[in-house]
Amino acid sequence: MNYRLRKGYAWLGAVAALTALALSGCSTGQAEGSPDGGQAGRIKVAFMQPPKAAMHPYSDDAFKYSRLSASETLVRLNADAGPEPLLATEWKKTDDLTWVFTLRDGVTFQDGAPFNAEAVKNTIDHASASTTPPRALKGVKLTTKVTGDNEVTIKTDIADAMLPNRLASPQFSIFSPAAYGNKDGSVNTIGTSTGPFKLTEINGSSTLKLDRYDDYWGDVAIAAGIDASFVPDGTARAASIRSGEADVAETIPVSQVSLLDPKMVNEVYMPRTTHIALNTKSGPFADPAVRAAARAAIDQKAIADTIYEGYADPAVGILGPALPWAESLRGDVKSSAAPAKVEGVKITLATYTDRAENPEIAVQAQAQLEKVGFVVTQDVREYANMEEEMLKGGFDAVIVSRNTMIDTGDPLSALMQDFSCEGGNNISQLCDPKIDAIFSEGLKFEPGEERQKATMAAEAAVLQRSATIPVTHERVVQGEQGTWVGFERDPFERRLITEHTKPVG
């Protein structure tokens, strides 16, 4: 199969909930000259979550670079979750394990280094060898070879029809050779990418600053730069839109929507599910019958109706209505174990405050669980302060909000990351060879009905074991002040500001 460069990218109206703009003090908003002689100032963004890993590009922080157009990958996903050209203009699959990528001419890194096959190989090799590799790489090993100045050949250790989608993950953004080489494994992302905006400052967990890159290979950005702030408090994000301290804000809490001018409210139907991951490895939920009891106790409709006020749908499975094929292919998702009696069983229910609804869900979930006999202790923090503990199985149950399309645009890969033995996001600590076999078989299929069927078979197997409790499928509100136009509303949560984002008028 061969994929060639197309004119125009297919991001037409990808409806999303991504991102945001900075609070006061980050920028005066003063206009600066743009290369075409027009005037365009700086965009202010209010992000929801602070950096999780000091803006390391192999972590979820990579999505912030992507949303700010501060980094680029070989390919990117279009509105249908299909790969399309970016730094690679063409790719072809030469056998079950081998892909050849042709690179774009005329690209330079922001530090002046040439963009070529050696640089691409260096990035992919460094990412693959990292002790914390990109999550999209889980389950697949890559080897690379330079086969021309503008050609890289990549081999996988297993048949993988989704390699281009994996390489579209922002965690595979290409950086200059100067970004690598630090003994601690860190990557210097300041001024070393190819994007239309150049990162100039990282101020801990408070702000980022970016300036326009005037030698960008494509259309030079209209905005002079971006000032991004991290505002985990949802009320503060909403207030920043009302006051004009932010031009765009990520994930406005449902409780704050009515306080905004309707013109500022942009609803995005998301492939995002809130679920309660249960620790299947240790503690009370190692018993499938106890998991079944917890699952039977949760009233999804009550949570959707009271907390989300119409901005979410009760969940039956892990995959929701944003994937129109999921419901018709859904198998038996009922627990295979009968619920146990759980009077007096003590559990810790954890969640994070970054998503304003999560603590409210925790309150309702606690009441519902205690009604059947559980004794519940809550542990609620900011995400950055609990991620490592979650991934190591430090809690009995964790309320999680998860975009099932975020890494590869492929829900099968997302489920594999969350519920396979080697999954990089396996909060439930599930390890079942039968489920892993479903994943391995599904990876062989090209995107289409057979892969969709494998995805739903995996979902059914996970839910029959009650490894998690689906709660709601979310619709997210992106707040826009009305000062700029051209913000992306992206369900894959990887684009927000582009080179074409421009002032109103």
Predicted segments, located by residue:
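Long beta-strand-rich cores associated with HINT superfamily self-processing modules
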Residues: 478-505
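Structural transition elements
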Residues: 309-343, 353-360
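Extracytoplasmic/peripheral linker and loop segments enriched in polar/acidic and small residues
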Residues: 384-386, 416-481, 505
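Surface-exposed binding/hinge segments that line
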Residues: 92, 98-102, 136-179, 201
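Ligand-site clamp/hinge motif
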Residues: 212-258
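N-terminal lobe/hinge region of extracytoplasmic solute-binding protein
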Residues: 46-94, 125, 192
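Gly/Pro-rich hinge or "lid" segments in bacterial periplasmic/extracellular proteins
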Residues: 168-219, 225
